[in-house]
Amino acid sequence: MIKIGNIELSSNVILAPMSNITDLEFRKLVKRFGAGLVVSEMIASRAMIMKSRQSMQKCAIMHDDPTSACVQLAGCEPDVIADAAKMNEDMGAKIIDLNFGCPAKKVVGGYAGSALMRDERLATKIFEATVKAVKIPVTVKMRMGWDDNTKNAPTLAVIAASSGVQMVTVHGRTRCQFYSGNANWDFIRVVKEAVKIPVIANGDITNFAKAKEALQKSGADGIMVGRGVYGKPWLISQIAYYLKTGKEKPAPSIAEQLDIIIKHYDAIIDYYGKSVGVPIARKHIIWYSSGLPSSAEFRCAVNLMNDPIAVKEKIAEFYMSVMDANK
């Protein structure tokens, strides 16, 4: 089983940090489906130390379980990242994850995210400053490198491990690929062979078969699932079950899915309030219903609704109609 410092994960299937997706309520939900670790949305370190409302909301954690209290920080200033890490530790975080992988132009333009892979000296300073600032484990998520000519993830992983970082996650693409092409799980094996700390494979893990293939090709200690959980938070438990038993675990029934969605919807509204919560919930509703009969009409209707009670009633009505059609 994977250990991050003194924290042992119950599963080697991890939920990836995703901006505007892995908020507190979504992490709670996926954790209930057996994720070994759930990671917060990326938080800008400078905004964190300024205690901006958005950053404080993003760093909210579940205090009863260390594997539910991992906060991801982004930035390019070692002292600022270190201060933000200490601040999160003081608020209860049990793991700090450093973002060296985000390919977004806005992030890279600020010399953060995957741009850090182009400056190994700066990366070293960030690793060392963060590890020194906190007593909790520090991990890092990166890509293979900036482009095909600079695939330096193995080198950066060695630097990270030497600096005291205790786990490395590698997305099997370069920054310049963004999300095009296929994730190169074979390359992750090179990273795994370069360090003794746990290495996690990430990228294109959307079903049972791909999860197994990613582990086999990468030799990684575990896998991190990202976009595959859109509308399927239960995928984490299905993958974990398949990797353990070799058998496929069926998805929840439509009735069970309705219960999951309603509880998730209620949690979003309670956490964010009505005016903010409904727009946030919409994207999840769209993903949940994707592929179901008449879902296009349902999604169009929900997109025009702002009253939280009406939206909830529409969800129930739609799923009941799907159940009736399946009788």
UniProtKB/Swiss-Prot annotation:
- Asked if the keyword DNA-binding belongs to this entry, the reply reads no
Where FMN is bound, by residue? 17-19, 72, 141, 202-204, 226-227
Q: Gene3D superfamilies from the entry?
A: Aldolase class I, Putative flavin oxidoreducatase, domain 2
By its UniProt entry, which Pfam families does this protein fall under?
Answer: Dus
Q: Name one GO molecular function term.
A: tRNA dihydrouridine synthase activity
Sorted UniProt keywords:
Flavoprotein, FMN, NADP, Oxidoreductase, RNA-binding, tRNA processing, tRNA-binding
- Enumerate the active-site residues: 102 (proton donor)
Q: What is this protein called?
A: Probable tRNA-dihydrouridine synthase
Species? Rickettsia typhi (strain ATCC VR-144 / Wilmington)
Taxon lineage: Bacteria, Pseudomonadati, Pseudomonadota, Alphaproteobacteria, Rickettsiales
Encoding gene, per UniProt annotation: dus
